[in-house]
Amino acid sequence: MPEVILNGPEGRIECMYSQGKESGCPVALILHPEPYQGGSMNNKVTYSLYQEFKNRGFSVLRFNFRGVGKSQGSFDNGEGELADAAAVLDWLQSQNLYSKFTFIAGFSFGSWIGMQLMMRRPEISGFICVSPPADKFDFAFLAPCPASGLIVHGRDNNSCLLYTSPSPLDFAISR
């Protein structure tokens, strides 16, 4: 699991990258939770997503947003973090020119950034959002959502509400 330092919009971006073994394997970009609350690429959910994609043969990359770990810059309320994610995705795709599938996976704040990136990058073919903070950030830009994906949210998660309306949507519950 080699460390990679990339040039980003605000300087260095610290990354961990694993190249898939097969030519043309799919790629996945993993995005961590809120930097201002201690989120980093070493968060256990972020790390678990990274490992799962790696175990399934993907070329996968996780990184620290600006101001976290060895990444330069400072928190920018999502705008700069989106620019970081776009720069990292550019690099990931440049290392995997024959890949036909690109996935985004984000945890909390990372899911909000990932969904914004997906709306700007039509080549993203799928997503995973873990505990998307719909009560803190506006996800209305996803109507309509351009790709298929998975939203994972704990039924009793009180720190990150999935919906804020009095009548929730129907959700499939898997146990």
Question: Where do the model's predicted regions map?
Answer:
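N-terminal cap/lid segment of alpha/beta-hydrolase-fold proteins
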Residues: M1-S23
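Short, surface-exposed "cap/lid" segments of acyl-processing enzymes
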Residues: S23-F53
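Conserved alpha/beta-hydrolase
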Residues: K54-K70
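Alpha/beta-hydrolase active-site loop
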Residues: D76-Q95
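Alpha/beta-hydrolase fold nucleophile elbow
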Residues: L97-G106
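Gly/Ala-rich beta-loop-alpha elbow adjacent to hydrolase catalytic centers
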Residues: G106-G110, G114
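Short beta-strand/loop motif that positions the catalytic acidic residue
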Residues: I151-H153
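Conserved small/polar residues in nucleotide/adenosyl-binding loops
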Residues: Y163-P168
